[in-house]
């Protein structure tokens, strides 16, 4: 089946509150995050630095929801890849309501950025694991570059074959 569009959201932001987690009747976990992203600019008329915070509702499912609930806290930085979805419902007063959320399910990603804020543990931010962290650097406009990828540079000094 041909795809007619792309619905992908990428966020790097800060949690505004601890994650909420619920379990639906079939036993699956559903987690909710409130993530803030900030944009700053200089006002051309006044020369003052301005900043605007945008709040995003993120919904996680399954194991990702459980991991977020266990390891993320208010103030944690997180990288999210998901898709936008708008839901519609009727409230108790009979008024139709809408909300737009970022859904992180199959094909989505949730990754902690930085260390865990709990100073009582000397772990690397993911529980008791002593495995080295493989953080990725994100440069504006480029693809993620891994620190663990120590391949030598490609040597293209050969003559062009035509």
From Swiss-Prot:
Q: What range(s) does the SSB domain occupy?
A: 6-111
Q: Where is the composition biased (Low complexity)?
A: 121-134
Membrane spanning residue stretches: none
Region described as Disordered: 116-162
* Keyword Phosphoprotein part of the UniProt annotation: no
Classification via PROSITE patterns? SSB
> Per UniProt, which keywords does this protein have?
DNA damage, DNA repair, DNA replication, DNA-binding
**Matches recorded under PANTHER family:** SINGLE-STRANDED DNA-BINDING PROTEIN
Q: Name one GO cellular component term.
A: nucleoid
Q: Which CDD domains has this protein been placed in?
A: SSB_OBF (cd04496)
Q: What InterPro entries does this protein's entry cite?
A: NA-bd_OB-fold, Primosome_PriB/ssb, ssDNA-bd
| Pfam families cross-referenced by the UniProt entry | SSB (PF00436)
Task: Kindly list the cysteine pairs connected by disulfide bridges.
Answer: none
User: Single Gene Ontology BP term?
Assistant: DNA replication
Give the molecular function GO annotations.
Answer: single-stranded DNA binding
Q: Does the keyword Transmembrane helix apply?
A: no
What is known about what this protein does?
This protein is essential for replication of the chromosomes and its single-stranded DNA phages. It is also involved in DNA recombination and repair.
* Name of the protein in question: Single-stranded DNA-binding protein
């Amino acid at each position: 089946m041909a795809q007619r569009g792309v619905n992908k959201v990428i966020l790097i932001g800060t949690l505004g509150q601890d994650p909420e987690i619920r379990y639906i009747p079939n036993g699956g976990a559903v987690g909710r995050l409130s993530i803030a992203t900030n944009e700053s600019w200089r006002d051309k008329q006044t020369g003052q630095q301005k900043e605007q915070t945008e709040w995003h509702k993120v919904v996680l499912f399954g194991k990702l929801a459980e991991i977020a609930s266990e390891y993320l806290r208010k103030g944690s930085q997180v990288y999210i890849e998901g898709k936008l979805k708008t839901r519609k419902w009727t409230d108790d007063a009979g008024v139709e309501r809408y909300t737009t959320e970022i859904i992180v399910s199959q094909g989505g990603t949730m990754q902690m950025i930085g260390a865990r804020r709990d100073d009582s543990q000397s772990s690397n931010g993911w529980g008791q694991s002593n495995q080295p962290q493989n953080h990725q650097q994100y440069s504006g406009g480029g693809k993620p570059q891994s620190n663990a990828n120590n391949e030598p540079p490609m040597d293209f000094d050969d003559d062009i074959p035509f």
